[in-house]
């Protein structure tokens, strides 16, 4: 074990070779393959996306055969067949990518474990459930009192495979490992199969998500490195909430450090952004940067980011991918929410000797609303209602049992309430619940060849209870006669950490 720890030291990973020796060390494969080590609660071995059937010994043999193959014997007619493997090429490329991703994650995951253990003296487990989407929750709760403009940014996508390889050059000092990665990418994939940019964001092959997410996270980290550096230059940006809400933007943990070359190249430019007081968040392939100042200052921010990405990544980044919007009169589609800034008036009484004054302070906060029109469009597309929001029956579910029909409708309703629990006004959600409940009743009435009124009279409160959310169930059991408590809960915003993707109905196109 001492020999293993010597190779897995996080501090040594940037000074010595770690990928190439790991690939050809037998005990590393035993360490990765022995699932009895789950008792140590390792983040790597508890990752739910890890393939339990992956054999690292086969990965090692495939890498060796990949180097020893004769390229003149490869058939050019069949892109999915490879003679040196004698089997499906994509299957073995998937195994190599899984093994490569597992090994390359070891130093960064160990760094996260050490940072979690040192944070306030508490050891945090199950941190792999915290993702970059969870960083949007504190952003929506921020106070924007002094902010006037926002930058809506589309993160530039890598136009060549070499850019993905070069983003790792600061982390991986092993040239052999970079050559292996470059050879592997060019041998098994082309650019079109690696990344598609039809929508804002990125779409990866489901079979190789772990490997490509690692490459994409390393690339995004380089894109966001300027924000980390500027944050460290300002005392206003020192936040204490990063330890509680870790995100996977910076290799599964918040790394508040930037390579020295950036400080040398952009020290002169930083004088333009003294005391920026900025708020930043990223979701999917888009990001938002809010800062105080005038339109001229935000325009400087815009050209600074464009020049930074063009110089650092050697790619053509158009200024049209960054839009400057005024914070007070601009709403945006944010993770399925319709977000806009709301002004809350706060009256403060100040008394000085015999005189008293009333001071009215306007506080800017994000108002997260449920978009009713896109949601009704999603329900209409799924045949739950018409485009005008009138509930209709679901004929394709008529062959199911009554309990299955009620369970499906109730589960959709609960998932929507769960996802939109952070909404500041939930009146729209009750309209969605009404549509789903009446659509369920129409489907059951159609199945039993009865009217909706007769079916509801016969079923009683059984159908109503299936559409109660978890919060409503708890309050109904604790305070059966206090309906005002239920209204108080739904006026507040609740964020759940088990939300790690955008709801399908909320992602209506």
Swiss-Prot record:
> Where are the annotated coiled coils located?
none
Compartment annotation: Plastid, Chloroplast
Going by the UniProt record, its keywords in alphabetical order are: Chloroplast, mRNA processing, Plastid, RNA-binding, tRNA processing
Question: Cross-referenced InterPro entries, in alphabetical order?
Answer: Domain_X, Maturase_MatK, Maturase_MatK_N
Single GO MF descriptor: RNA binding
Please give the superkingdom of this protein's source.
Eukaryota
- GO cellular component, as recorded: chloroplast
Q: Do the record's keywords include Ribosomal protein?
A: no
Spell out the family assignment given in the record's similarity comment. Answer: Belongs to the intron maturase 2 family. MatK subfamily.
Q: What is this protein called?
A: Maturase K
